Amino acid sequence: STLMRSSAASDVYKRQTDAAQSAAELDAILERGSVNIYMFHGGTNFCFMNGANDYDKLTPDVTSYDYDSPLSEDGQITPKYEAFRNVIARHAPIPEVSFRTDIRQAAYGALCCDGVCSLFDALDVLSTAHSSREPRSMERFGQGYGYILYRTMLPTAMEVSSIELTKAADRAQIFIDGVPALTLYDRELSGAHAVKWSLPQGAQLDILVENLGRVNYSQKMMQQRKGIDGAVLLDGQALQNWQIWTLPLESGALKQIGFSPLSACRQPAFYHFALDVQQKGDTFLDLSGWGKGCVFLNGFNLGRFWNVGPQQRLYIPAPLLKDGVNDLVVFETEGFSANTVCFHDKPELRL
C-alpha cells in the first residue's frame, strides 16, 4: 500500500521544515512503503490563479507556491533535494542525471515610475460598460477573474447611516465621487455597516470588487461567484440603475491605457515603468512601499502583491523578459505607491 504524507496548501510559509528532519521522515516512510512528495516543485501561481482556502474565513493563497519544496520556485536545487536524493538512493537505484540548465539570476536594481493613469480614467479603454437595473456578479458577464466595477448616481440627496452589500465577494472598495470611503473584506461583507455620509443628489458611487481567488474544494465550491450578485442597500434602500465594467485586465486592454506624467493619486491606478534589459536573467520584483494590487510585464500577469505579506517579491523568469525595453505596469488599488520598484536576484519572505 502507498503511504502519503502531505500538508494543506494554506499557510505555505509557516510549514517550512528542516532538510535533515524532512529527510529522516522520508527515510522512515520508505522503510514501510511508498511516498508521494507534495510538492516536489511548487512553482508560481501566475496571473490570478492563486486560489484560496476557507476556514470560516477566506484565506487566499499568495502568488508564490514555493512550498519549501526540494526544487525552489525558480528551479534551484536545494539542500532538501540533495538530502532526499541520498535517502531514496538507500532504498532504490537512482540513475546519474546531468543537470544542464544554467539558471542565470539578475539584479537590475531600482526603477522609477514614468507615468500614471487612474483606473477611473481608463475604464472605457479597458472595458465596455454594461447597464443593469441590479448589480450582477462577474460570472454573469462571462468574466472569470480579476476585478469588476459598479457605478450608480444617487437619484436624490441622502443622509446615510448604513450600507450593506448582499451576496458580495471578495473585497469591495467604495468610492464617493472618486474619494475612498470604505473597504469591506470577506466576512465584513456580511450585514450592514454604520457610516455617516451626507450625499448630494447626483453623487457618484463606485464599488470596485476584487476576486481574490476561488476555493477549490468542499461545499464552498458552490459559493464562489465574485462581485456583487445581490443588492447595494443605503439605509435599507436598494440602489438601482448600474453601469458595470468587467476588468479581467487582459494584455490587449492594458496596451490601450494612456499614461500621464507622474502625480499623486489616491485612487486605484496603473503605474508604468520601462525596464531596459541587456542580459536576461531570472529576477525578483520588490514592491516595498506599495499597497495592494497586481503587476504586468509586457502584458503578462506576474501575479498579486499585498503589503500584509508574507510574500515581498514576485518571481520573473528570464523568458518573460525581452532584450531592450520591457513594459512594466503596476496596478495598485489602495493609493499607496512608492513610485519606485526594485529588481533583486533572490526572493524574500517575511514570516
What positions do the PLM features span?
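Single conserved hydrophobic/aromatic residue that forms the stacking wall/gate
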Residues: 1-9, 13
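Carbohydrate-binding surfaces of carbohydrate-active enzymes
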Residues: 10, 28-33, 37-244, 249-261, ...
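Extracellular glycoside hydrolase catalytic/binding regions
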Residues: 10-26
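Short beta-strands within extracellular/lumenal beta-sheet-rich domains
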Residues: 144-153, 266-276
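Short strand-edge motifs at loop-to-beta-strand transitions and within beta-strands
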Residues: 152, 191-195, 271-273, 310-314
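Aromatic-lined ligand-binding clefts that engage carbohydrates, nucleic acids, or primary amines
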Residues: 160-176, 275-298, 305-306, 328-331
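Extracellular Ig-like/FN3 beta-sandwich strand-entry sites
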Residues: 200-204, 280, 323-325
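Terminal leader/tail segments of proteins
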Residues: 284, 314-351
